[in-house]
Regions:
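Conserved NAD+-utilizing ADP-ribose enzyme module
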Residues: 2-300
Length: 300
């Protein structure tokens, strides 16, 4: 992933200043080019399991439009540790495949592109697997806000519909409006320091909490009347695709330092196929140990 060098923008923060709410009406619908959204996601590392040729291991499910056909599903992991766990399971269940398989960094833009394409042509699909602890943290937040309720052991939305999960992203928001708070930061990239304004959404709640605690100690007035909220990745992408508010272009997804470091270590010598170039790879069918056969555009 050549563009992983640009992750220094988010990984090398020198200092940051939490500012006022950045979006007047979060979720306002108009239009933002898909290309721009994918570009924003292009520097966000996620992880795949690939074979010895660098081709993603996939699995097949019945095509939702034609049960006589198959849909090839690509699996992406938000956490490299979850990818390692899945790889170990494959080594146990299918040693002939797992013995030559490895974990490869990929761009989140590739996963989202496949998901968008699958809406038009479900020949391919995508399964994005979130970190379980982060999903649990998200559920707790949504219960506290009243957006989720638990009835008879089932988690439901406030409208009474089953909660379908997703990949949670945590952000600092204005307590009254719920609008995300922007950050103005001094970032170091290629040995140079510059100022950048962006709206960070974190995959790890505790990572955001540490940032907020540090800001509160230094400038308590900057984070007054704010709180941590959560949005699912698919909802955020849908918002980015449906708004022309210029501040939407300032959205940045912040991976964990561990994930960034893992991806950067691979970027020097890993020639694995980029996911957004892998619409039709000749890859073996993966054992369905991830439970991914429930949909072709799923953000669990």
């Amino acid at each position: 992933m050549k563009r992983l060098a640009h992750l220094g923008v988010l990984a090398g923060l020198v200092s940051s200043l939490w500012l006022a709410p950045a979006i007047g009406r979060y979720g306002t619908a108009t239009a933002l080019p898909e290309e721009q959204v994918l570009q924003i996601l292009n520097n966000v590392p996620v992880f795949m399991i690939t074979n010895d040729k660098g081709e993603p291991l996939t699995f097949e499910i019945p095509n939702p439009q034609d049960q006589n056909k198959k849909t090839q599903v690509f699996t992406f992991f938000i956490s490299q540790k979850d990818a390692e766990g899945a790889l170990n399971a494959i080594k146990t269940q299918r040693p002939e495949i797992g013995g030559v398989a490895r974990i490869s960094a990929a761009a989140l833009s590739g996963a989202v592109k496949i998901a968008l394409e699958s809406r038009k042509n479900p020949v391919v699909g995508v399964d994005i697997i979130p970190s379980k602890p982060q999903l649990e943290a998200a559920v707790n937040l949504l219960k506290q806000s009243g957006d989720l309720v638990e009835r008879d052991g089932k988690i439901l939305t406030k409208e009474g519909k089953p909660f379908r999960g997703g990949t949670p992203l945590f952000f600092l928001a204005d307590s009254k409006t719920g609008n995300p708070i922007a950050v103005e930061a001094q970032v170091r990239e290629n040995g140079q320091t510059r100022t950048q304004r962006f709206i960070p959404f974190y995959f790890d709640k505790m990572q955001l909490q540490r940032e907020v605690d540090q800001a509160r100690q230094q400038r308590p007035e900057l984070v007054k009347d704010t709180g941590i909220r959560v949005v699912m990745l698919d909802n955020l992408v849908a918002t980015m695709l449906s708004t022309n508010d210029p501040v939407a272009g300032q959205i940045q997804l912040v991976q964990t330092p561990e994930a960034i470091q893992f991806a950067l270590q691979q970027s020097g010598g890993n020639n694995a196929q980029r996911p957004n170039q892998a619409n039709q790879p000749a890859s073996p069918q993966r054992p369905n140990q991830q439970g991914g056969g429930q949909g072709t555009n799923r953000n669990r």
